[in-house]
From Swiss-Prot:
This is Elongation factor 2. Keywords: Cytoplasm, Elongation factor, GTP-binding, Nucleotide-binding, Protein biosynthesis. The lineage of its organism: Archaea, Thermoproteota, Thermoprotei, Thermoproteales, Thermoproteaceae. PROSITE patterns: G_TR_2 (PS51722). GTP binds at residues 32-39, 98-102, 152-155. It comes from the Archaea. The keyword GTP-binding applies.
Amino acid sequence: MSSAVRIVEKQLDEILAIARNPAQIRNAGTLAHVDHGKTTTTDSLLMGAGLLSPKVAGKALAMDYVPIEQLRQMTVKAANISLYFEYGGKPYLINFVDTPGHVDFTGHVTRSLRVMDGGLVVVDAVEGVMTQTETVVRQALEEYVRPVLFINKIDRLIKELRLSPQEIQQRILTIVKDFNALIEMFAPPEFKDKWKIDPGKGQMAMGSALHKWGITIPMAQKAGIKFSNIIDAYEKGYVDQLAQEFPLYKTLLSMIIEHVPPPNVAQKYRIPRLWRGDLNSEVGKALLEADPNGPTVIAVSKVNKDPHAGLIVTGRVFSGTIREGDEIYIIGRKMKKKVLQTYIYMGPSRIIVPYMPAGNIVALMGVDEARAGDTLVDPRISDIPPFEKMRYIAEPVVTVAIEPKNPAELAKLVEALKDLVIEDPTLDLKIDQETGQILLSGVGTLHLEIATWLLKERSKTEFTVSPPLIRFRETVRERSQVWEGKSPNKHNRLYFYVEPLDETTIELIATKEITEDQDPRERAKILREKAGWDTDEARGIWAIDDRYFNVIVDKTSGIQYLREIRDYIVQGFRWATEAGPLAQEPIRGVKVVLVDAVVHEDPAHRGPAQIMPATKNAIFAAMLSAKPTVLEPLLRLDIKVAPDYIGAVTSVLNKHRGKILDMTQQEYMAYLRAELPVLESFTISDELRAAAAGKIFWSMQFSRWAPVPESMLLDLVKQLRKKKGLKEEIPKPTDFVEVY
């Protein structure tokens, strides 16, 4: 098999000819921890495809096409590109996605994985497998995306750490071992062994994206190259020769073509995981085969605002062929739209194509109402189930208030904000209808910094941004008594109690194992077997709040007119969970149970304006009598530091309510895993750097929600209430319901 990958400039008709043959398509992308060199690696591939000049590759950061990314040298959005290659005498089309590595942008990674079958995981040879590597590999494996490994920055082992050939070899083996441990931990059972990296089979490459060379073990054996030769190349100044003999793009593309499955193979095992429909139906069979002649089914992975073309929807065609002029149905939004134009991506530029068959990534104009995670289908099969919802690992926990300097520009600002939230569903926008206050929440301070920068660029308005505030959650610690909620007209009475929702059920909601729209019997069976629910209670679930993890259950029997007001009760429940009774923070992990009701016979007396407040007030009263508390977001820190500084680093963490979970020592580094409240994290970076005299790497990511220490609870609730202009004293159940 020839390892030559000939790269030639190809006309569109040739690209379309390959696009029709799934065996010659690969859908892959880069995944990595921040600063491990993903984008520089991708640039090297573009250079190989003749899309960047060799001088510029590695400096151009071509896929970082939002200007702030070039400024901060960091990928913020996931970018797409289609590359043409010849390998082993055959032409291939590689649809490539570059994804962000910074923890604040894991939402973009989640959306990219849906369209990929393979992930090129880039790991820094010095830092090794880090938190974010673990997060993206776990996300990839959850989406049944096969990982291959590129160990980057080998030059640092030679120039900075001055390691010997044996030490370099040992370092690489350690990284492969750590990487395979992640696969053992997170891979689907049937792929645990198959997907582990075997360097001898060419499933791992090593090299330097900066110096544009890369090599696999089989290539090195064939060419008789040893680590000592690579060290020589750096010490004697002939690294360029290394890049000529083993250009990185050839090595990585050969690896992708050989070890990432084509769509018609990958879809056989990915579709049963991503789609809950009947696999023996016409649609099911077409999806499993990636059949270009089957009914059209597209999974949307991202939506971008284009100043000239409106919203551009990008997704993967899993079955059928999409053409300009086709009508398409958006499942879940229950609407038909006409595709005005179809494109493929070449970096930031879109190239118009007449059609795109199954197995490829396509961009569409004209489907403005579609959002990331939606399923687009041929209108004739509009009743099929959509693809599984996407699971975002990080939650928006930091908020800023945004205010236009000129009130006349408010509408313009809000319009631009709404577009931002369409593009990035991990942003959360709240506009207070009464006060006009705009609150934007993101995964971290950096996420918000970039969102507000984009907002300024696009809205062309001047606005102020408040210092960041932490988002909290409200919950309960025990079961309440039953409380009566009365409608304002006194004609309807609803009786509820609340209790904590168990962690297993929260996890089932988070992993989408139970959803609001699945068959109630199937859902009840899962809850009974996995979370120990009572059958009747599990069947009585009316709604699942998968944003904040709450459920409402109907335990009544034989109540007249209850069915007519069910939707209003559910709306009242959702209204309550948005902002709880303690401090108007969202409610998390609460089971709301309806046990009785008296409903007026006349529909005019039992409308939403009567039922929704009765529901909300009873839930609030019940919560306040169930040992309510506030949950704060915690971050997980992974720290690598020189052993001499462990004491200093530990004391910084202790000062900020941090807790060390684990500590190990290897070679010349100590590894600490710790948890730290987000509330305490704003100055931690500078303090850690100072404590370890700069000799420290660390990364942070959202870990979990945990109750605020009892000693802080009262003061925190008062502070939150004061900030929101509420009276400081904590409300009592009787502030929401009448007690006789």
